[in-house]
Regions:
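A generic structural signal for short, non-catalytic loop/turn and secondary-structure boundary residues
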Residues: 7, 40-41, 69-71, 86, ...
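A short glycine-rich beta-alpha junction/loop motif
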Residues: 90-101, 129-148
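Aromatic/pi-system hotspot detector in well-structured domains
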Residues: 9-12, 17, 111-119, 127-132
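Short loop/beta submotifs within extracellular cysteine-rich repeat domains
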Residues: 55-56, 122-127
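Short leucine-rich amphipathic alpha-helical surface patches
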Residues: 119-123, 144-147
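Non-catalytic DNA-recognition/assembly elements of restriction-modification systems
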Residues: 1-55
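A structural detector for beta-sheet-dominated domains
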Residues: 7, 15, 103, 146-148
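A short beta-sheet element
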Residues: 57-117
Length: 148
């Protein structure tokens, strides 16, 4: 078995690695939005929530015509409670669920699982009252994650 050389590994800012978007006077990773249950129609697009079960999937719905309804593909979801999953398929995100998509490379299962383990270690330092929406995901230009 080849030994992994980690001598060049370093810290990175969330905003250096993942796609961000402007929000008010700051950058943040894309996030989902609250959609009333009455507006969701059964379909084939998974809806990701903060649950720790079934890869975060709460149900399957059709696309709806709303500025708040956003669909992402091939991404890592991170909820404000710290649940993290890889989604190689199209999915919509509920409120307080963030979308991590690499800036310059497509995710694959191996890269995603590696990044998930690194992110889980990093966010384990946050307490419930720090909820992730108020910490690294909401200020990705400042927060660093160390790969170790």
């Amino acid at each position: 078995m080849n030994k992994l050389d980690i001598s060049d590994w370093q810290e990175f800012r969330i905003s250096e690695l993942f796609i961000t978007e402007p929000s008010k006077n700051k950058l943040q990773v894309p996030t989902g939005a609250s959609i009333a249950r009455k507006d969701l129609v059964d379909g084939d697009i998974p809806r990701i929530t903060v649950t720790n079960f079934n890869n975060g999937i709460v149900g399957y719905y059709k696309n709806i015509d709303s500025d708040n309804y956003r669909v992402f593909e091939n991404f890592i979801s991170v909820s404000f409670l710290g649940t993290i999953f890889y989604h190689p398929y199209k999915a919509s995100l509920d409120m307080k669920v963030h979308c991590l998509k690499l800036k310059n490379k497509d995710l694959n299962k191996d890269i995603a699982l590696f990044l998930i383990s690194v992110i889980k270690k990093h966010i384990s330092y946050f307490a419930y009252n720090d909820q992730l929406m108020y910490s690294p995901m909401s200020r990705p230009e400042y927060h660093k994650i160390k790969i170790e």
